Amino acid sequence: MADYQEYRRRILHRRWRRMFITAALLILLVLLAAVGVLWKRLHREPAPNTAQGPTILQQELTGSEWNTISYTPARRLSVQTLDNGMTAMDFRLAAQPASPAVERSSFSDVSFLGDSLTQGMQIYSSGLPEASFCAYRGANPSVVVNGTTCKRSDGGTEVPMEVLTARQPPVLYILLGTNVLNRDGDYSSFLTYYRLMLDMISQALPNTQIYVQSITPVRPEVRSSHPGLYKERLCEINNELAAIALEKNCAFLNLWEALADDNGDLKAEYAQPDGIHIKPEGYPAWVEYL
């Protein structure tokens, strides 16, 4: 009997020792987890700016809602000037440098995304009618972001992103903005939509080289009927577009090199009567630049 009691005592002792060790380990793990959570809270980084994400807009904004979207300006990049001074982003200096000319046939598999200015490139024989186009009168970046159904020049309808996603072009040229910049004042919503549009396109077309084209110059008299379309403001906006393009790993093209006169206005011989759109005679200069 004594041997049995001794044996039972030893078994219970081992059992309690195992239970004690297990409990101690559990307590230690809980303490370590608590310390880890506390450390993360004390050292966590600021939350990223969700305004730059590609999915915050799921419905189309119209009317008074247009200017309610916040915008954080693209990072300011410094560039070297001829007098060795440093200045903020200048779209003229940020533009893609010239490269050897290519044949028109090279544009047969590229796509253009734009508004009525780009429609001219599609319609006029002096443009690039052999290319593919997503060009719609009155279009702007929000149309692309919100998946709006757009009307083509031939009367058909389509959703721009659906067409581009199905097409997967090797190269895409974008020119959008004139239609929403008519009014003077804040243009932050336009830039926000432009950022979102580039994010969406880059995600949908991972193998496509994207070229962001500058807002085109206009004639000086345009300001009387369209207060937001004047040289100084368009230069400011193009500076922002150039910074956004570089930030998004897109190339930036300065169309003013091909279309503007020495004063920075749309060349008179290229201008339609409205001072904004381009005559057929102006498209060869645009094509040559591309």
Protein language model features and the residues they cover:
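Active-site-proximal loop/turn and secondary-structure-junction residues that shape catalytic pockets
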Residues: 180, 216-219
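Charged helix-capping and loop-helix junction motifs
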Residues: 187-197, 234-235
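A short helix->loop->beta-strand "cap" motif at the edges of active sites that frequently abuts
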Residues: 205-209
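Catalytic His-Asp segment of secreted/periplasmic serine-dependent ester chemistry enzymes
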Residues: 218-290
